[in-house]
């Protein structure tokens, strides 16, 4: 399967660089998996697609202000993007500077703070801070907006690049499907008899890394930490018993649930995952999906194609572009029910050259 099969042309004007005034005011493109039918709605119309007894699974990770600016002892400027918090004082981070810092060297953080470069682990640097990491980041860190937003972070991003139910600090990118939900909408969902459960997957910066191989099967996913508790396992079992559907809010919730069910049975799990879901891979847990519009040739677009079917997904994206939907993290959303017989690119009907 070729990565190039997942490309599409997106007008720059459709990249959402700022959030809308209200979370719930996004548009919603629905895709019916069994038929491929599309419908253009508003995000609050999601309520019409939910049934009493359904279970919605959210990712409650909290985005940390993971971008720091500073300088080396030599005076050279650098930029730090925390990838993973290791403990109260240590992190793994990407460091951008003219010359990489050496082990044992000091880094002075703009706004106050100091770190030592401990060791290099491939592309990541292990840094030890003189004070506790999370309070330091809250004090002087910047929200790690995706590269395609292409603007400095603003004060409003601290609130809007964060779900209203975020609890567990550790992500360096938001689980963006959740950005559309406000408290009144969550209350309306509960009032309809829809249950909720929460997993945690700390989204890493690798989510924005391009796929650098030609064949999908040659791609190696970055690792991210996740936790699926026994309460989630029990909630899914209860949902199945009452005939409800498991609806994942975001691709990170999908990856969490399917990672915890790799052998076909959902079990509690805590640890790293590098699961790569692309067309041809079965789904063991998820019946429906709320998700944003993803980058061309991205692993997230491949996941959606695995869930909805490749031709159906690409047709939906073409329709979204035609109708002016806003793309990526601050953009609009889709609601997709699983295609029971999804096809992959190489399974599509061949062109007639007669």
Curated annotation (Swiss-Prot):
UniProt keyword list: Cytoplasm, Queuosine biosynthesis, S-adenosyl-L-methionine, Transferase
EC number per UniProt: 2.4.99.17
Keyword Cytoplasm tagged: yes
Pathway given in the UniProt record: tRNA modification; tRNA-queuosine biosynthesis
GO biological process, one term: queuosine biosynthetic process
Entry coiled-coil feature ranges: none
Reaction(s) the record says it catalyses: 7-aminomethyl-7-carbaguanosine(34) in tRNA + S-adenosyl-L-methionine = epoxyqueuosine(34) in tRNA + adenine + L-methionine + 2 H(+)
Entries under InterPro entries matching the protein: QueA (IPR003699), QueA_dom1 (IPR042118), QueA_dom2 (IPR042119), QueA_sf (IPR036100)
Class of the enzyme per the UniProt entry, highest EC level: transferase
One GO cellular component, as annotated: cytoplasm
Keyword S-adenosyl-L-methionine: yes
Pfam family, one: Queuosine_synth
Principal subcellular localization: cytoplasm
Matches recorded under NCBIfam families: PRK00147.1, queA
Subunit structure: Monomer.
Its job: Transfers and isomerizes the ribose moiety from AdoMet to the 7-aminomethyl group of 7-deazaguanine (preQ1-tRNA) to give epoxyqueuosine (oQ-tRNA).
Family affiliation: Belongs to the QueA family.
PANTHER family: S-ADENOSYLMETHIONINE:TRNA RIBOSYLTRANSFERASE-ISOMERASE
Protein's name in the database: S-adenosylmethionine:tRNA ribosyltransferase-isomerase
Organism: Pseudomonas savastanoi pv. phaseolicola (strain 1448A / Race 6) (Pseudomonas syringae pv. phaseolicola (strain 1448A / Race 6))
């Amino acid at each position: 399967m070729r990565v190039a099969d997942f490309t599409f042309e997106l007008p720059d004007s459709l990249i959402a660089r700022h959030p809308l005034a209200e979370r719930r005011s996004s548009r919603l493109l629905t895709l019916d998996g069994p038929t491929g039918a599309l419908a253009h709605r508003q995000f609050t119309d999601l309520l019409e697609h939910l049934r009493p007894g359904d279970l919605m699974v959210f990712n409650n990770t909290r985005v940390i202000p993971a971008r720091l600016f500073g300088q080396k002892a030599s005076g050279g400027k650098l930029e730090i993007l925390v990838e993973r918090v290791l403990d109260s004082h240590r992190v793994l981070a990407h460091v951008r500077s003219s010359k990489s810092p050496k082990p044992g060297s000091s880094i002075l953080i703009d706004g106050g703070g100091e770190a030592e470069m401990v060791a290099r682990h491939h592309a990541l640097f292990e840094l030890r801070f003189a004070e506790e990491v999370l309070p330091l980041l809250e004090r002087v860190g910047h929200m790690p907006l995706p590269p395609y937003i292409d603007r400095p972070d603003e004060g409003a991003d601290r609130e809007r690049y964060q779900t209203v139910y975020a609890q567990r600090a550790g992500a360096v990118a938001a689980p963006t499907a959740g950005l559309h939900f406000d408290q009144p909408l969550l209350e309306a969902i509960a009032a309809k008899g829809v249950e909720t459960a929460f997993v945690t997957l700390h989204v890493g910066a690798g989510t924005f890394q391009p796929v650098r191989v030609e064949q999908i099967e040659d791609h190696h996913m970055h690792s991210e930490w996740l936790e699926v508790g026994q309460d989630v396992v029990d909630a899914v079992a209860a949902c199945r018993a009452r005939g409800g559907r498991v609806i994942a809010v975001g691709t990170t919730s999908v990856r969490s649930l399917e990672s915890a069910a790799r052998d076909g049975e959902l079990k509690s799990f805590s640890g790293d995952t590098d699961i790569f879901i692309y067309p041809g891979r079965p789904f063991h847990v998820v019946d429906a999906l709320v998700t944003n519009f993803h980058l061309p040739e991205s692993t997230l677009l491949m996941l959606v194609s695995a869930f909805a079917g490749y031709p159906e997904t690409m047709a939906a994206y073409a329709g979204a572009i035609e109708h002016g939907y806003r793309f990526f993290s601050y953009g609009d959303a889709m609601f997709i029910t699983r295609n029971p017989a999804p096809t992959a690119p190489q399974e599509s009907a061949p062109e007639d050259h007669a």
